[in-house]
């Protein structure tokens, strides 16, 4: 019973559509009708600005972290925190409070890792920031970090680097989260190929793509 309650709580936590609600209640703007139509951090930044984007990012990360820490907070030592955190990402991606149309799972996945393996998250965040600096594309940075996450979760434990040993639940969760992130970025991948992906005004833009307003 406790397990079911933890899963349900994590899913409902993840389901809070941060960007959508911030847009509706503070800006009277429906994010679904602007930019890419996505309710995640990137579109919130683009449409509503820095304050709203930063708030969305922090809350979406916090959703994942809090869900991951739930078993610890309620003293359920026999329940895997990473497994509970996964249901927050599921909620974020398919939120019951927003017609099951949610974000692209990046921020909340980061939150889950922050609660479970913070040093490992720091490594993936460095990969994300480096890719973002080189290519000026948030989507490409997210995809690169996801692929690196899968490779590293399979290899780092052997060298006891950042991850102390193989944890099959962590490994499965990382692989599934990476798959969700990649699947949620299908449109972005097409635009990257066509050299029409949205750029941010930071970094080297090594692909030499021209800035575009394409959404």
Swiss-Prot record:
GO terms for cellular component: plasma membrane. InterPro entries: G3P_acylTferase_PlsY. One of its GO terms (molecular function) is acyl-phosphate glycerol-3-phosphate acyltransferase activity. It comes from the Bacteria. It is an enzyme of class 2 (transferase). It is found in: Cell membrane. Catalyzes the transfer of an acyl group from acyl-phosphate (acyl-PO(4)) to glycerol-3-phosphate (G3P) to form lysophosphatidic acid (LPA). This enzyme utilizes acyl-phosphate as fatty acyl donor, but not acyl-CoA or acyl-ACP. This is Glycerol-3-phosphate acyltransferase. Pathway: Lipid metabolism; phospholipid metabolism. The chain crosses the membrane at residues 3-23, 42-61, 68-90, 110-130, 134-154, 162-182. One of its GO terms (biological process) is phospholipid biosynthetic process. It catalyses: an acyl phosphate + sn-glycerol 3-phosphate = a 1-acyl-sn-glycero-3-phosphate + phosphate. Probably interacts with PlsX.
């Amino acid at each position: 019973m406790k397990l079911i309650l933890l899963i349900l709580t994590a899913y409902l936590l993840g389901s809070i559509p941060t960007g959508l609600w911030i847009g509706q209640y503070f800006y009277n703007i429906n994010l679904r009708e602007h930019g890419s139509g996505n309710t995640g951090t990137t579109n919130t930044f683009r449409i509503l600005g820095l304050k709203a984007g930063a708030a969305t990012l922090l809350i979406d990360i916090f959703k994942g972290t809090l869900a991951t820490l739930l078993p610890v907070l309620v003293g359920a030592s026999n329940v895997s925190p990473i497994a509970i955190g996964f249901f927050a990402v599921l909620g974020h991606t398919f939120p019951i409070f927003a017609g099951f149309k949610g974000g692209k799972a990046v921020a909340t996945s980061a939150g889950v890792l922050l609660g479970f393996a913070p040093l490992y998250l720091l490594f993936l965040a460095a990969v994300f920031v480096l890719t973002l600096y080189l290519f000026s594309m948030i989507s490409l940075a997210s995809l690169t970090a996801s692929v690196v996450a899968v490779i590293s979760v399979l290899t780092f434990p052997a060298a006891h680097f950042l991850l102390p040993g193989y944890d099959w639940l962590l490994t499965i969760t990382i692989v599934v989260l990476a798959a969700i992130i990649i699947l949620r970025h299908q449109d972005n991948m097409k635009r990257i190929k066509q050299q029409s992906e949205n750029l941010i005004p930071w970094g080297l833009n090594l692909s030499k793509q021209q800035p575009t307003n394409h959404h």
